[in-house]
A protein has these predicted regions:
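Thiamine diphosphate
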Residues: 13, 36-57, 61-64, 271-279
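Active-site-proximal gating segment of KS-fold condensing enzymes and close homologs
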Residues: 7-29, 41-51, 128, 271, ...
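Catalytic phosphate/nucleotide-handling subdomain of diverse soluble enzymes
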Residues: 238-300, 315
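Short loop/turn motifs at secondary-structure junctions and domain boundaries
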Residues: 75-79, 241-242, 404-408
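Generic structural signal for well-ordered beta-strand positions
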Residues: 94, 259, 423-426
Length: 558
């Protein structure tokens, strides 16, 4: 039995292969954790821990030091991106050409998959009729690079959003108007030729985010104030070349409460609470009467990885199906006992009642006990299959790589000290269409957390390497944002009901971070009067741009 902080319970199979044991001999329990962000998607300690336990025949605890973790675990891929964008003088995009190079480090790990995501998102949320993208991932002697929140989308977002601001300056057009003219709409195709089957609502997300920043402020003394924007499309659901699936079990206890069993690892994103909320909604139960059992490879149905913003989409739909069948059993039992038509039975607050006759009602406990006594326990195991498997033609790059996408926009306000180059983000607003909020507090927290994490990437975080060796493998010199660095964040959630998740929901875990660095880059570049495109946007890099400004044109005030 292994207990590991992981995003993938299926790693028990890797341990079994290493130990040359039948898969059923290895049990993996997922530990509670506050975040994974891709760093716990790879096999990390599982096989080492399994070997130690097998050889010593004793309990073993394996804990990495901060330095060991920095050195031994995957990082976000460093990218070099070269873009050229063509447009008419009226601002309609005509063509985009991109060269994308990622540093894989010493091993491939998930680098090919990350690069594929970059290819799919290379043109962002824009309508571009002619596209050419060449992408390469290369081996180097640098630390291994692997999965990290947004999985290749954040790097391309920086490139295409920087191009949109540069193009706006070149043709003398308001950058918001330029985006509005070229945003994808229902029926348009993305770079791979996939046709969007729902309305992205990009114009509204941009306007709402921009307005949420509030009144424009003027800088004082050496401080310049500017605003920037980042819009994005980010897929939710896994690109796995086979049809993705997830399973869940929902059952009623004799006291009328419900239990959900699903192996979806909860990595701090509210996966467990969302599955409980779905069950409660379908069955007509108070949320506190639904219990979740998960994180155990032996006792919960396979649900796949907590990666790719897929768990609400996949496991959420599996729970929705299973709970729907349980509801049908409860309704049929109630109809029989209350001598009514199933169409007239309502489920509310743990009771089944005849519509229009509230005195004709029974608690769920009575229904479950009666069904169980007849050998019909009220429990269902069900499976959800994604609508389609990813398809990409390797010769043309065309196809349908994902079932759906989440669209959104972030806007930021920055202060830049023209004497020191120091940058401070003072306001941040984000607007996304999430389809349907299953747990609004959790969704808002995802967006706030993703945005602050994105600020860290934009301004602070940098792995310093010398001959392939990390020179700052600790949190003393590798800076991450704290509460003192976090600006006020305004989150606006739109609910179009157009998603493929339960009740029309869309995933938000990774999209919450995608456009943040791009928005900060555009704001800082506007304040500096010249492009600042190397991340992080350190004081030295900003100061260099301040000393060599290029006159802006066609930009919105502020």
């Amino acid at each position: 039995v292994l207990r590991v902080s992981t995003q993938v319970l299926e790693h028990f199979r890797d341990v079994a292969e290493v130990l040359q044991l039948p898969h059923g001999r290895v049990r993996l329990e997922g530990a509670y954790l506050g975040g994974g962000f891709g760093g716990k998607e790879d096999v990390t300690v599982e096989c080492l821990l399994g070997l130690l336990v097998w050889k010593t025949r004793r309990p073993v605890q394996l804990v990495f030091s901060r330095e060991e973790s920095f050195i031994g675990h995957g990082k976000r891929h460093p990218y070099v991106l070269r873009y050229k964008t063509g447009a008419t003088r009226s601002g309609e995009l005509v063509a985009m050409e991109a060269e994308v190079i990622s540093d894989s480090g010493a091993y491939a790990a998930l680098s090919p998959w990350v690069l594929l995501y970059s290819l799919v998102t290379a043109t962002g949320p824009y309508r571009v009729p002619n596209v050419k993208v060449d992408a390469h991932t290369v081996y180097t002697n640098n630390p291994i690079a692997s999965a990290y929140r947004t999985f290749g989308s954040i790097q391309t977002c920086v490139a295409y959003e920087g191009q949109m601001d540069a193009l706006a300056r070149a043709i003398g057009m308001d950058p918001l108007l330029l985006r509005e003219k070229n945003f994808l709409r229902k029926g348009d195709s993305i770079a791979t030729g996939q046709v969007l089957e729902s309305e992205p609502m990009l114009g509204e997300t941009m306007r709402r985010a921009w307005e949420a920043l509030g009144p424009v402020r003027a800088g004082e003394g050496p401080v310049r104030i500017a605003r920037g924007l980042g819009a994005s499309l980010t897929p939710y659901g896994r690109m796995c070349w086979t049809r993705d699936s997830a399973s869940a079990w929902v059952g009623m206890e004799l006291d009328g409460t419900a239990v959900v069993r699903c192996a979806a690892p909860d990595v701090g994103g509210g996966q467990t609470s969302s599955l409980c909320s779905i069950t409660a909604e379908i069955l007509g139960l108070p949320l506190e009467q639904v219990t979740a059992v998960g994180r155990d490879s032996h006792f919960t149905p396979r649900a796949g990885t907590t990666t790719a913003t897929r768990q609400l989409f996949m496991s959420g739909n599996a729970v929705l199906k299973a709970a729907g069948e349980v509801r049908r059993h409860l309704v049929d039992q109630a109809a029989e006992m209350l001598e009514a038509s199933p169409a007239d039975i309502e489920l509310l607050d743990g009771r089944a009642m005849v519509r229009g006759a509230p005195d004709r009602a029974l608690p769920f406990s009575a229904l479950v006990r009666a069904a169980t006594a007849r050998g019909r326990p009220v429990q269902v195991l069900d499976k959800y299959d994604a609508p389609s498997a990813p398809t990409i033609d390797p010769a043309t790059g065309q196809g349908k790589p994902f079932n759906d996408y989440t669209f959104g926009t972030q806007a930021v306000e920055v202060e830049v000290d023209e004497e020191t180059g120091q940058t401070r983000v003072t306001r941040l607003a984000a607007c996304y269409d999430i389809g349907q909020a299953i747990n609004r507090q959790s969704a808002e927290g995802q967006v706030e957390g993703g945005a602050i994490q994105g600020l860290g990437h934009a301004i602070l975080e940098e792995v310093v390497l010398e001959d392939g060796v990390s020179k700052n493998p600790h949190l003393l010199d590798y800076k991450i944002p704290t509460t003192l660095d976090a600006p006020p964040v305004v989150v606006v959630l739109l609910e179009s009901g157009q998603g493929l998740g339960p009740f029309g929901a869309k995933g938000i875990g990774e999209p919450a971070m995608t456009p943040t660095p791009a928005a900060v880059m555009n704001a800082v570049s506007r304040a500096a009067g010249a492009p600042v495109v190397q991340f992080p946007l350190t004081a030295e890099r900003v100061l260099a741009a301040l000393k060599h400004p290029s006159p802006p044109s066609g930009e919105r005030a502020g």
